Amino acid sequence: MISSVVQSRDSKRENSLWLRKGQLMDYLERTGRVFDVQRYSIHDGPGIRTIVFLKGCVLRCRWCCNPESQEYKIQTMKVLGEDKVIGRDVTVREMIEEVECDRPYYYRSGGGMTLSGGECLCQPEFARDLLRAAKERGINTAIESMACAPWENIEMILPYLDLYLMDIKHTDPIKHKEFTGKSNELMMENARKVALSKMTKLVIRVPVIPTFNDTVEEIQNIARFAATLPGVEKIHLLPYHRLGQDKYEGLGRKYLMEGIEPPSPEHMITLKKAVHAVCGLDCQIGG
């Protein structure tokens, strides 16, 4: 009995270590790259949350409101005429200590930590270990992601994930590639795999973008797909906005959605009704 207890304890310790340059390292010392931390958020998951924004993304969505997230490298962006460094390297330990500062708010509101980006799965080991650190401290976990990653990168985070907020932007692979730079087959396949795993709660989110996917037919096609995913009960429609437009100028880039107006509240209600017309999912505007 004593031997089995010791073996179990040793096994847990081995699982908390990883190899770096020939040395075993505690997983809390793993380093990742973030570009922002937003505290007291009431979006992107239940309750009051801390959103950790990770650097790097494989898509180049025309409407992206965080263009400074796309490159993994640390950048300089003009903000109000001043140079601002975008990106910093942190360990899991440093980041979780920052997240834990707001534990009382999580406790009272049912909130927690959400990983966003960019695409947090571009740093899969760091994302996994940060989620693990939160779970081991009793903090609710969520990610905001479009699942454009190898399945093994997604599978490794699921044991530590309470909520997956997954973007599905379009069902047409050609139009998806035209507006984001990549086709959608991998993302839709991964959505099915996450749903079938039953390891986390899955919510489908749709950025509603004029000229891209804002017709009744396009939204209904996404809703029909979402309704085929086992366990999925909710779909969020997120109206396009231009809050990140100035960032493109600060990065010396052209904003490709110039002149495109956000969808009206009336049109968003029409799309919500269109979802309800074809499936039984709970549909909400915003999220």
Question: What do these predicted regions represent?
Answer:
Residues 76, 80, 162-163, 204, ...:
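Short alpha-helix boundary/capping motifs
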Residues 90, 182-189, 266, 270:
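A general alpha-helical scaffold signature found inside nucleotide-binding enzyme cores
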Residues 96-250:
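Conserved AdoMet/S-adenosylmethionine-binding subsite of the radical SAM
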Residues 45-47, 56, 63-64, 87, ...:
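Glycine-centered flexibility sites
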Residues 1-43, 210-287:
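Auxiliary Fe-S-binding modules of radical SAM enzymes
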Residues 1-91, 101-109:
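N-terminal [4Fe-4S]-dependent radical SAM core
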Residues 81-85, 177-183, 252-260:
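Short glycine-enriched, charge-decorated loop/helix-capping segments at active-site entrances
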Residues 81-84, 93-100, 265-276:
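Short alpha-helical interface patches
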